[in-house]
Amino acid sequence: MIEGLLGRKLGMTQIFDDEGRAIPVTVLEVGPCVVTQVKTSDRDGYQAVQLGFGHRKRQNRPMQGHLRASGASPRYLKEVRVDDATRFQVGQVIDCTIFQPGQLVDVIGWRKGRGFQGGVKRHGFAGGPKTHGQSDRHRAPGSIGPTTDPGRVHKGKRMAGRMGPVRVTVQNLRVERVDPQRNLVLVRGAVPGHPNGLVIVRYAVKQRRAKATA
């Protein structure tokens, strides 16, 4: 069994359930993914498959040789662990039908890069007073540490810095709809990243459990 696929984020919209309630969903184009390499325990020491997604017009010579057996020219490659690698063949296509409406998935994306930002935008600081003689401290972080002892700024202090495109995992998103004809998966809620950004959709690792009732 394969646990996840590559895809891209298309954007957000809303759908309506049977009772007419609006549900915010993110539309993901998941797959089709081509198996470009199969790794087995005998040869590689572990079992996994390498998946390719998207299309790249030109590949360099080493990549052309690597992809020749699969007949594909993907833009992205990702290795995914599997239980039994012998069930997969190079060139096999896997689509979004491995996901079903109602199940929970984890979506991995890369948050938008916003460059160097101050404490108000980066950490949600309140800033300084807007009145009482303040003129240049409206968005200042305030004090960043104690006095002579210890005489330094502690590690991990929240300060201004780069809000870079870091990897973010959103867990336990419910699959609302699956459209195999267009390779679309609609998940409830928001997903990190910009439109057309790469995402990884996998089965939920930490399944939510219902609270026990007395």
Curated annotation (Swiss-Prot):
One of its GO terms (biological process) is translation. One of its GO terms (cellular component) is cytosolic large ribosomal subunit. Pfam families: Ribosomal_L3 (PF00297). Keywords: Ribonucleoprotein, Ribosomal protein, RNA-binding, rRNA-binding. InterPro entries: Ribosomal_uL3 (IPR000597), Ribosomal_uL3_bac/org-type (IPR019927), Transl_B-barrel_sf (IPR009000). Residues 119-159 are annotated as: Disordered. Transmembrane segments: none annotated. One of its GO terms (molecular function) is rRNA binding. One of the primary rRNA binding proteins, it binds directly near the 3'-end of the 23S rRNA, where it nucleates assembly of the 50S subunit. NCBIfam families: L3_bact. Part of the 50S ribosomal subunit. Forms a cluster with proteins L14 and L19. Belongs to the universal ribosomal protein uL3 family. This is Large ribosomal subunit protein uL3. It comes from Thermomicrobium roseum (strain ATCC 27502 / DSM 5159 / P-2).
